[in-house]
């Protein structure tokens, strides 16, 4: 069990009653340099190694993860990260779905 699930529940950055600026200052003050750098990264998750991306690299966003891995990504953030910062999960609809074997690619106009 990590600090996230036990000790961060009542910290200022998790309190929606406080002003946003105060919550941000509190969270940034708790983050390590590695966590701050990681939060600025968006990495390809097709490898399936979500623990490495989320826990070791502290990524703020992942691309191209399998829909079946989404619950695992959320659970990894909640159970294995120090501060429980939510993860942004995205996919590139114009050509990103073509990364998956057998995916249907529909034509799309780009103006």
Stretches found by the model and what they are:
Residues 2-110:
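N-terminal beta-rich core of secreted/periplasmic extracellular enzymes
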